[in-house]
Curated annotation (Swiss-Prot):
Catalysed reactions, as listed in the record: tRNA(Asx) + L-aspartate + ATP = L-aspartyl-tRNA(Asx) + AMP + diphosphate
Organism of this sequence: Campylobacter jejuni subsp. jejuni serotype O:23/36 (strain 81-176)
Residues annotated as binding ATP: R219, D220, E221, Q228, E477, G529, L530, D531, R532
CDD domains documented for this protein: AspRS_core, EcAspRS_like_N
Taxonomic path: Bacteria, Pseudomonadati, Campylobacterota, Epsilonproteobacteria, Campylobacterales
Positions marked as site (Important for tRNA non-discrimination): H30, G82
Matches recorded under Pfam families: GAD (PF02938), tRNA-synt_2 (PF00152), tRNA_anti-codon (PF01336)
GO biological process terms held by the UniProt record: aspartyl-tRNA aminoacylation
Chain intervals for the UniProt region annotation (Aspartate): 197-200
Identification of the protein by name: Aspartate--tRNA(Asp/Asn) ligase
Localisation per UniProt entry: Cytoplasm
Amino acid sequence: MRSHYNTDLGISHVGQSVKLCGWVNSYRDHGGVIFIDLRDRSGIIQLVCDPNDSKEAHEIASNARNEFVLIAEGAIRPRGEGLVNPKLKTGEIEVVVSKLTIENESAVPPFTIADESVNEELRLKYRFLDLRNPKLYENFALRSKACIAARNSLANMGFLEVETPILTKATPEGARDYLVPSRVHQGEFYALPQSPQLFKQLLMCSGFDRYFQIAKCFRDEDLRADRQPEFTQIDVEMSFCEQKDVINVAETFLKDIFKACGKEIQTPFRQMQYKDAMENYGSDKPDLRFDLKFIDVIDIFAKSNNEIFANIAKDTKKNRIKAIRVPKGDTIFSKRQMQRFEEFVRKFGAQGLAFIQVKEDGLKGPLCKFFSEEDLNELSKRCELEVGDVVFFGAGAKKTVLDYMGRFRIFLANELNLIDPNALEFLWVVDFPMFEQNDDGSYSAMHHPFTMPKNIDETDLEEISSIAYDVVLNGVELGGGSIRIHKNDIQQKVFKLLNIDEEQQKEKFGFLLDALSFGAPPHGGIAIGLDRLIMLVTGANSIREVIAFPKTQRAQCLMTDAPSPASNEAMRELGIKLRENIK
């Protein structure tokens, strides 16, 4: 029907006849000549409807309004002197309309498509209108390129695309399952998959060797800016591999994805052990676009005559004292800013925020009186302090200190404008602990219970490490993976350490244990969050901007009003009766 998309046209097309299709973005009547900004998925082009060129087209144009659907035919001409619009890709040209058709009319839209100040809830309610914005379209064009690049890259490396079931069995993977009642087997439920984890392992047991899938996954968890109840991941599994093989494959397809999106990235990515990431940056996904690395000073504080710090420093296993040096910070930060810094860390469990300033005549601050001159010199040397610097200290329980100092590090970087928004800093975090302790004292798998442990015979669960790895970009976890357990006895031992008894093992994972009993090969894999990846590539503020029809932070679709009550008839067929006053 059309000859071109709007932004395919430029000054080189002057004199050509074209046929364009799209929506009225805006409409202006200037002394009898009507100007229409016609919008299609690519962008905007200006139509000129002059009665001297076509009375019929001009008359039809006079009835057009915002969001009417038009088909326009005419000739390209350059805009007049001083009328070029540099904000538009087509800003040097316009279309002199000879024929115009109103293909469909529109009700008055609830908002202007290009208005970025519109409330997000209103945009989501009328998402079909919101998606007419060419800026949003660009996100999905990029997403499509990324998916095509991922498929081509993995296929070139010998991976086979296989779809795994959506209706499956509930298995504990760290979040709540979405359950689907069975009409045929009343009282029983399917679960929507949190990931294809077990099925892709079964494919390795089946000898498929290399699998991938762009998989839809579901998790019933609290939502944040980078989470949705349904999300998409690039899921990969391979047999007869080590960690380095999976990392090489992931770097290859990530490089191809970024190239397709117009960005060049360097491989291999740097690697960092989990314990180093936590001890030096207070995060298992550190943002390395800036420095502000922690400095361990617990041994120096052990020599202070401040009873609080000295007591903290006695237990180097459970406690931490970390410093962050800010070069020239003493010349930058006001007294009010220093107060804000303390208010910030207190929100995350800090008792306060001690600091020392470096003046021309030496170190200054309330802390200094608790140290000998020798200890202050040692502190200055370790922190590499210079005149004008300020150094902040966090002290207390290990988990609390690393958490609030890690958050404070990012807070400082934003305050100091240290973060380059165009930088792409990739990192592999490796050697994760196998288990982590919950608030109630029990243990759970840090990644999942199918990860291969390195030292399974270690008696202290917190000392057992795993062959697990996360890929991080600019402080955001893009995805993670591991080498899997491929031996039945090791898998059962891990289940036992997690207090999953033999009966539960058989009930929940019997099919996996069976598969591991029939010659399962060594295997491992990775999953990359596609939504997060595209969010970072496009610079979007939320994954809602890169998902066509997203849910709100209350897991609702405002456009379709989902979730919604089921009819009584449907509930009877499923054999389900809700409790009264369930809300």
